């Protein structure tokens, strides 16, 4: 959530910055609500002053034995008006809160202004795409003989679900273990196991609700009278970031660096018809997430560090990639600045997103009321960052395509062999005669 003081000081400036993100701020609605709020607060202050004056007058009159009934009646009327004003103020503040909850974060000044992904800016590349001396297959054709089972996944749960078997399932698990070990043993993160089902207020904290309810899988339990609504997480960023919800941490505890391997559940409501083949876009997929909670002055250094941690995974796996700075129109709702990592997929002859690393500054912290005690001993909002380190399924796709061989086998990257029992190559299971 944005700082409402920012809007009060420079409403037109904030409106322009939000317009750069493709969001139209209802300036008239905000201004009208603010005018009502100020009018009620001014009237309340006047009534409070009048009531205090009358209270003193009543005391003096009683001391003289004078009749105070008329003055007391006026005091009662003031109380009724103040109570009505308080109720009206609560209504206005609720409407302001709803308006604020729908506003995305404002972009950092270093973010390129643009409309969509066509305006993103490439920052750098690593690695050289492999030159194949045979016809390259995509991950579906490579993986199906080795244990990718789309047919059974669809039979069990419908479209965009996949079953993994045998060595492919083991390779998928090896990738997640390798990522977690790298982040915990080399990058300083604490491994965390989190709930996969969370309460609605948790999603308000990280910005998925109220705007993106249709992208979430909802879980309901209980009857009509005691129904409880919860949600499956779309990323473990949600549960990791909310660990500091409604708390004040000591400055000495920062930075907090957490990582988790979890399934992620997304309805992909706005992705009908996109990436329908294979594992690129799934309703259920695994991801290793990185989250950092830091002091405000450290957040952009932390963002660069987090991008480097995601890059390290790709480099250790020998997968070519590029780093993209997202423009204002392509960033996620909560982000102030985002870098995407895109891995090379030879069958598509292009780079595809495999990680997204974002600094949300105080946007999520304000929604969560997550604070730290600064050097002056005063509570101050933390900054929160999140990044994929990496999406496990898409990394599996990249390994299958980049490490495929002409005979249909797949070479296991050296970094994964300790997690695969020393296996250097995955071959299709022998067919029974």
UniProtKB/Swiss-Prot annotation:
It is an enzyme of class 6 (ligase). Pathway: Aminoacyl-tRNA biosynthesis; selenocysteinyl-tRNA(Sec) biosynthesis; L-seryl-tRNA(Sec) from L-serine and tRNA(Sec): step 1/1. The keyword Cell wall biogenesis/degradation does not apply. Keywords: Aminoacyl-tRNA synthetase, ATP-binding, Cytoplasm, Ligase, Nucleotide-binding, Protein biosynthesis. It is found in: Cytoplasm. Pfam families: Seryl_tRNA_N (PF02403), tRNA-synt_2b (PF00587). GO terms for cellular component: cytoplasm. Its main location: cytoplasm. L-serine binds at residues 235-237, 289, 388. One of its GO terms (molecular function) is ATP binding. InterPro entries: aa-tRNA-synt_IIb (IPR002314), aa-tRNA-synth_II (IPR006195), aa-tRNA-synth_II/BPL/LPL (IPR045864), Ser-tRNA-ligase_type_1 (IPR002317), Ser-tRNA-synth_1_N (IPR015866), SerRS_1_N_sf (IPR042103), SerRS_core (IPR033729), tRNA-bd_arm (IPR010978). ATP binds at residues 266-268, 353-356. It catalyses: tRNA(Ser) + L-serine + ATP = L-seryl-tRNA(Ser) + AMP + diphosphate + H(+); tRNA(Sec) + L-serine + ATP = L-seryl-tRNA(Sec) + AMP + diphosphate + H(+). Its EC number is 6.1.1.11. Homodimer. The tRNA molecule binds across the dimer. NCBIfam families: serS (TIGR00414). Belongs to the class-II aminoacyl-tRNA synthetase family. Type-1 seryl-tRNA synthetase subfamily. This is Serine--tRNA ligase. It comes from Burkholderia lata (strain ATCC 17760 / DSM 23089 / LMG 22485 / NCIMB 9086 / R18194 / 383). The gene is serS.
């Amino acid at each position: 959530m944005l700082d409402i003081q920012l809007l009060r000081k420079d409403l037109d400036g904030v409106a322009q910055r939000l317009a750069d993100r493709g969001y139209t701020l209802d300036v008239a609605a905000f201004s009208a609500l603010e005018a009502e709020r100020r009018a009620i607060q001014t009237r309340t202050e006047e009534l409070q002053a009048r009531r205090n004056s009358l209270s003193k007058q009543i005391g003096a009159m009683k001391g003289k034995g004078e009749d105070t009934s008329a003055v007391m009646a006026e005091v009662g009327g003031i109380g009724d008006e103040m109570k009505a004003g308080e109720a009206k103020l609560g209504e206005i503040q609720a409407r302001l809160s709803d308006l604020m909850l729908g506003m995305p974060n404002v972009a950092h000044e270093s973010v390129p202004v643009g409309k969509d992904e066509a305006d993103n800016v490439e920052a750098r590349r690593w690695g050289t795409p492999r030159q194949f001396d045979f016809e390259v297959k995509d991950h579906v054709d490579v993986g199906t003989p080795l244990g990718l089972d789309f047919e059974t996944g669809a039979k069990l749960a419908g479209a965009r679900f996949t079953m993994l078997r045998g060595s492919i399932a083991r390779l998928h698990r090896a990738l997640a273990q390798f990522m977690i070990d790298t982040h915990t043993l080399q990058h300083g993160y604490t491994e965390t196991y989190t709930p996969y089902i969370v309460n609605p207020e948790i999603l308000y904290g990280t910005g998925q609700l109220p705007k993106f309810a249709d992208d979430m899988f909802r879980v309901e339990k209980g009857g009509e009278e005691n129904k409880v609504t919860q949600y499956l997480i779309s990323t473990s960023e949600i549960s990791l970031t909310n660990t500091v919800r409604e708390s004040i941490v000591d400055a000495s505890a920062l930075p907090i660096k957490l990582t988790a391997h979890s399934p992620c559940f997304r309805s992909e409501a706005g992705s009908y018809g996109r990436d329908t083949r294979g594992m690129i876009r799934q309703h259920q997929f695994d991801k290793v997430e990185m989250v950092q909670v830091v002091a405000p002055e450290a957040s952009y250094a932390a963002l660069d560090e987090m991008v480097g941690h995601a890059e390290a995974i790709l480099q250790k796996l020998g997968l070519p990639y590029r780093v993209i700075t997202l423009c204002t129109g392509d960033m996620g709702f909560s982000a102030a600045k985002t870098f995407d990592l895109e891995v090379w997929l030879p069958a598509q002859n292009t780079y595809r997103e495999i990680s997204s690393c974002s600094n949300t500054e105080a946007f999520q912290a304000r929604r969560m009321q997550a604070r730290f005690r600064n050097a002056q001993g005063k509570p101050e909002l933390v900054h929160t960052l999140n990044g994929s380190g990496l999406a496990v399924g898409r990394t599996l796709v990249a390994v299958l395509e980049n490490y495929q061989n002409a005979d249909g086998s797949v070479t296991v990257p050296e970094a994964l062999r300790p997690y695969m029992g020393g296996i250097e190559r995955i071959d299709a299971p022998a067919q029974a005669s």
